[in-house]
Amino acid sequence: MNHESQQQFDPENAPAFERLRDRRRAKRRRVLRVALTLFVCAALLGGAAYYAHRQIIKPYLDTPVSAPEQPPLPEPDPAPEPEPAPEPEPAPEPEPEPGQSALTEAQATDATKTLDLELYSSSAVLVDVQSGTVLAEKGMDEKIYPASMTKVMTLLVAAENLPDLDATFTMTQAIIDPLYLAGASMAGYVNGETVTMRDLLYGAVVPSGAEATEALAQAVAGSEEAFVAMMNEKAAALGLANTHFMNTSGLHDENHYSTVREIALILQAALENETCAEILSAENYRASETEQHPDGLAMTNKFLYRVHHEYSLGGAEITAAKTGYTAEAMNCCASAGKTPDGRSVICVTANAWTGEFCIEDHIALYTKYCGSAEAEG
């Protein structure tokens, strides 16, 4: 075994051995410090490079894109203040167009009597025509179904649009049958009967004939639908906001309605037409002779007949009337009359249980508010 390559521990050389070992340890520490220093420097250099790179990228990530700034626009010159416009002179009241009316609804006053238990009818109005005021009322603006009071408007529109009352119309079964089946009141004209326009007008009002109103509608407008449109146009021309018609006779329809105050205005407009006033005032009428009625069809306004022959109105007088009835409308009537001193009045009632109650309400209103104590006595 070769022992020359290995150093042996010699106690006599111990100090020298310790010094050699210390030098080796010091050398290793220096090497470690240098390596550590190099590592730290490398880390610092890497961090600086990363920071510089982030500062280059960050503005593109964090800064919002915005439009380039525009130079401020110059402020506009203040607009000159407009000169005050001269106040317009009030326009003159327009004249009513043809077909329109200057009539207005009667208005209530402090003197208007409010009726309640003294009437059978649930709605009523008594109007002084000359002053345009309401003398007495009960629910005058409540919705009603006008039933055959509708025929006052039918009469008015037909009379205004018939150039020749002697022109004729031939009655048809197609007109008669549906109305008969609906329970409408009839004048009595029959299929194939040739009737003058005048006789149709009387037949629509005096006996309240629904076949006469349908014939008038066809003669004037070509159909009932077209004629009803004319009726609603007339209502609008009169300023009636609570009236709408669906047919010419007053057969019940939920969309066929009015109020007693507006029916009063329709009657007032009709009475200003000479032909209508004559027909609404007729107690009896006999139509022209025809093949089917050789003596002419006889007609009677039963309401006028009764009030003229069975009642006293305290000096007042009922001069015109049109009644109506359906199960929904019950008994109603629009009448016109005169006070003892000659003033014109209009009375409309609706929703009385019987025809007798309807008549009694008109008698009571004319007697109490239009008659005189001297005449009653």
PLM features per residue range, with description:
Residues M1-L32:
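N-terminal Lys/Arg-rich, disordered targeting/topogenic segments
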Residues R24, R28-L36, P146, E193, ...:
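Structural motif marking the loop-to-transmembrane transition
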Residues A35-A48:
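Hydrophobic membrane-insertion alpha-helices, especially the h-region
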